Amino acid sequence: MSTQTIAERVREASARGTRLPIAGARTWFDPGPDALSVAAERGIVEYTPGDLTLTARAGTTLAELARATGAERQWLTLDPHGTDAGTIGATVATASWGPLAHAFGTPRDLVLGLEAVTGDGAIIRTGGRVVKNVAGFDLTRLFTGSWGSLAVITEVTVRLRARPEVDETIAIAVRDDAPDALGALLAKVRAASAAPLALELLSPAIAARLGAGASTVLLARLGGNAESVRAQRAALAAVSSVTTVGDDMWRAIRGSEAAESAVIRLSARPSRLAELWRTVREATSHWSGAYAHATVGRGVVRLVAPDPGPGVTDILTVAGGGMPIVERLGSLPGFGVDPGGAPPELWRRIRSAFDPHGILSSEAA
């Protein structure tokens, strides 16, 4: 299916006023048999290792991108939760990210340009690989994280990074039994002469499941040449005791969420992460099977529970630092996902500009 074919499908749905859900590999959410799938839109269109840029069709999987860039000792520093069977299109449409966002940022920081089909069937290009963007709008950032509610993403251009010579992960011992202990530790880690690629806080439940101990632990992913990594490890060892853990820990964290889980993301200023962490831990202390992990550099706590149950509404009211974002509530009906966090009237006006008949779904898979 080409971009032109996708545009024709969208125009037909727009003429009929028929809702048109968008699907990728359906690894996270299946919008049903009537969805417009871009999973067949696979393949790398252009890869210039010397420029550290790559353009791929939206249905290209993260695994395919990892293989291609790995052969050049490069990588796309997006590690969204789930598996590498997910597509780059869905990753960008949902602005999904993982632990590497600590150092490298989110999709809005890494996506250089897009090709997309708007809700009236128009084909547009934004950002990279074009001479001129639409005046007054950063459409690349607008479409990234819009959950398919503004346009069908058909092609993505991303920024790559060189892979570090050494990539090592350590576990830093954490005391969070005293009210100020975690905050003090995180302050010392931030002040240390180290620049972790990822810095992820794990609650005891997920730490035990992944074989990282039975208490709260802080994982630090260190990268660089051998001398740099040794120096960073020594700096962090001066803060608290450290042990080496396997690199597969990061893949295990990303793949730990079952499809039926509730996933709720809460955020605060990074300096207030310890306070938010304590609030979430206390609120979920009697929630069987619940666990949490936090991306320190983003100030974000990710709460996962196998059975949302009635307690989910309580979680939505205890966010210590900001509005919670519901990524998924298992199979519970009646919940949606706010794709942008924008005021409703502003979001309605934006959607009407790109999808005048309201046919595009705010769901992506």
Residue positions per predicted region:
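Short beta-strand
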Residues: 22, 198-204, 291-296
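C-terminal substrate-binding/cap subdomain adjacent to the FAD-binding core in PCMH-type
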Residues: 112-262
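N-terminal glycine-rich flavin-associated loop
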Residues: 1-20, 38-84, 92, 96-129, ...
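Conserved glycine-rich FAD pyrophosphate-binding loop
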Residues: 39, 242-365
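Short active-site-proximal "capping" loops at secondary-structure junctions
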Residues: 25-29, 41-43
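N-terminal accessory segments
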Residues: 1-27, 318-339
